[in-house]
Curated annotation (Swiss-Prot):
It comes from the Bacteria. GO terms for molecular function: 2-hydroxy-3-keto-5-methylthiopentenyl-1-phosphate phosphatase activity. InterPro entries: HAD-like_hydrolase_phosphatase, HAD-like_sf, HAD-SF_hydro_IB_MtnX, HAD_hydro_PyrdxlP_Pase-like, HAD_sf. This is 2-hydroxy-3-keto-5-methylthiopentenyl-1-phosphate phosphatase. It is an enzyme of class 3 (hydrolase).
Amino acid sequence: MSIQVFCDFDGTITNNDNIMSIMEKFAPPEAEEIKQKILSQELSIQEGVSQLFRLIPINLHDDIIQFLQETAEIRTGFHEFIQFINENNISFYVISGGMDFFVYPLLQEIIPKEQIYCNATDFSGEFVEVKWPHPCDEQCQHSCGLCKSSLIRKLSSKDDFHIVIGDSITDLQATKQADKVFARDFLITKCEENRIAYTPFETFHDVLAELKHLLEVKL
């Protein structure tokens, strides 16, 4: 049995949800209604996020990149967590509903690109179009966009010990496949609603301490 860690990006590795930060800064007011429909599950994640980015003109690309470079912050303890992961040969994947144009640059000096799974974007039209290279498999019908539960099935085996780290509705389906869940913010609410056991965290020092405990006691 091997340990497989699957970690969200926006609001988990980074302090803020970068998609929501982009929308608050650059999108028109109607983005807020779409956001609420995603959180309430009135809209699927795929449809909702597609609608959000179709509100963003492509000529804002450089402004968005500069904005994220100035505002995106990596959560405290993440570098130490990754160092421990690497030293102990634990498999680690970023499974992110975020977009390639900001996920890859923000992680380029920390995580190898081949360990990062995220959505793609097309800036060739008038507005940003999201592409979905990691859709739901036959076992998931939730229109996740980037389907985290499908990626877990693809990248690991049932015999592995699955750890999921996340913060929001986009991580909910993945938690249902996890042996251990680390949750913060809105994901805590969804775990409690669905009676999914979780460990709360605010920094990756919290996650690292619990992971060390798991290695010593359970695994």
